[in-house]
Amino acid sequence: MEDSTINGSHPHEPHAGGFATRLNWLRAGVLGANDGIVSTAGLVVGVAAATTTTSAIFTAGIAGLSAGALSMAVGEYVSVSTQRDSERALLAKERRELAEVPDYELAELTDIYRAKGLSPDTARKVAEELTAHDAFTAHAEAELGLNPRALTNPWQAAFSSAIAFTLGALLPLLAILLPPVTARIPVTVAAVLLALALTGSISARLGGSDPVRAVLRVVLGGALAMLVTYGIGQLADVAGI
């Protein structure tokens, strides 16, 4: 069995491209949940400021949740489908060039490894061995930065975005509906700001940035959204709309 550490002290770290892909998916999920929290919170707080009717608040919240989740899913599907089409076109071009001009492609791969600091002889040997093992994958990864067997699935991206948005949107919706009428808005604001602080901290840690600044940005943004919609709801209530 291989030791899990190098020299008994340094644990192996995940270097595979799949790890970075999983991090990107997790970060996108956090951002999707954040969108659901902010947009739904703004909507239900605005409606609750205009009326205390539970059915009206519930209907507005469910409508906003559904529209937001579908919008996220459609947008993500279109975006990822376009990206995948472009990646497939690049991969098809690379496969064609490997069949038509293999010597040129080998020289190109050699140059890539020379640019990374390998000596000409070593770069040539690496290029030849990788080409002999799996020429298409070697060239796709080195030249295009793509793994032909791990292209993003647009349906998976759409479903993940919709689920993340829905989970985020459920928090302010439940927070506005469950408490007594007089406590609805304060409880919702508190729950939303705490949730935004959590998502801001998680996204900052995933991205390696300062969590304090990230939390402040997202919390202030969410507070501003709720303040604006609360003001609009109050104006609608006063005007009798």
What name fits each language-model region?
Residues 190, 194-209:
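Transmembrane alpha-helical segments of integral membrane proteins
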Residues 22-44, 148-174:
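Transmembrane alpha-helical segments and their cytosolic interface motifs
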Residues 2-25, 80-162:
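Cytosol/matrix-facing amphipathic helices and coiled-coil assembly/linker segments
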Residues 29, 57-62, 158-162, 186-190, ...:
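Hydrophobic alpha-helical transmembrane segments
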Residues 230-241:
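Juxtamembrane boundary at the C-terminal end of a transmembrane helix
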Residues 35, 74, 123-127, 165, ...:
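Residue-level signature of catalytic and energy-coupling elements of molecular machines
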Residues 217-230:
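Small-residue-rich segments of transmembrane alpha-helices in multi-pass membrane proteins
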Residues 2-79:
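Internal alpha-helical transmembrane segments
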